[in-house]
Amino acid sequence: MPVKRSLKLDDQFEENSFGPSKIMRKKSITAFSPTTGTYQLSPFSSPRTPKEQEHRDGPSNGTRKWSVLSSPARQDSTVKGSDGFMMLLSKIERSSEKTMEIMKNLSSLQALEGNRQLEDLLGVSLVPCSLKSEAKKTKELMTKVMKQKLFEKKNSRIPPKEHHPNSFEFLKAILN
């Protein structure tokens, strides 16, 4: 059976319902932008004073640092990084003997020597001088990589273009 429903909203409206609301919040005039005609959503979204803006953007008098990608300092950092890596490898080689001695002296490790779970736990097998040999292999690989990078850098230079004195010589060179 169809039921007809109606909303009785007439009694909820007052005479001043389309007038200003009773609850009004005072909005700061500094948060209003006459350019866009909008209010600022957050009081912290943009600086209010020019001094704050300058501090936020950094110096604009040409002393701003260039991007890391385009600066020559990036090339130096890769060289320093590879040197640092090589230094760490040499430290590992020197300390590998001490580490192997400590591992041999630990009685709990000696009891579990040859156990696969121990090797999984430590991440290395207990083969004598394995740390030293791994560090040596890594060092050799790093020197190969550095040599390859230097070789690629030398070969990546653009060869000087041949200069053709006139259009006839140029076309002749293209056809040959």
From Swiss-Prot:
Principal subcellular localization: nucleus
Covalent cross-link Glycyl lysine isopeptide (Lys-Gly) (interchain with G-Cter in SUMO2), where: K8, K22
Subunit text: Homodimer; mediated by the coiled coil domain. Interacts with CCNA2 and MTA1. Interacts with NFKB1 NF-kappa-B subunit. Component of the CENPA-CAD complex, composed of CENPI, CENPK, CENPL, CENPO, CENPP, CENPQ, CENPR and CENPS. The CENPA-CAD complex interacts with the CENPA-NAC complex, at least composed of CENPA, CENPC, CENPH, CENPM, CENPN, CENPT and CENPU. Interacts with TASOR.
Motif (LXXLL motif): 118-122
Amino acid composition bias (Basic and acidic residues), ranges on this chain: 49-58
Comp. bias intervals (Polar residues): 34-48, 60-80
Residue ranges of coiled coil: 82-112
Modified residues (Phosphoserine): S17, S28, S71
Localisation per UniProt entry: Nucleus; Chromosome, Centromere; Chromosome, Centromere, Kinetochore
Region named Disordered: 34-80
Name of the protein described by the UniProt record: Centromere protein R
Comment field on protein domains: The DD1 domain (also called RepD1 domain) mediates the corepressor function and is essential in the triggering of apoptosis.
Keyword Membrane: no
Species the sequence originates in: Rattus norvegicus
Ranges where the record places region DD1: 20-50
Record function comment: Transcription coregulator that can have both coactivator and corepressor functions. Involved in the coactivation of nuclear receptors for retinoid X (RXRs) and thyroid hormone (TRs) in a ligand-dependent fashion. In contrast, it does not coactivate nuclear receptors for retinoic acid, vitamin D, progesterone receptor, nor glucocorticoid. Acts as a coactivator for estrogen receptor alpha. Acts as a transcriptional corepressor via its interaction with the NFKB1 NF-kappa-B subunit, possibly by interfering with the transactivation domain of NFKB1.
Keyword hit for Transmembrane: no
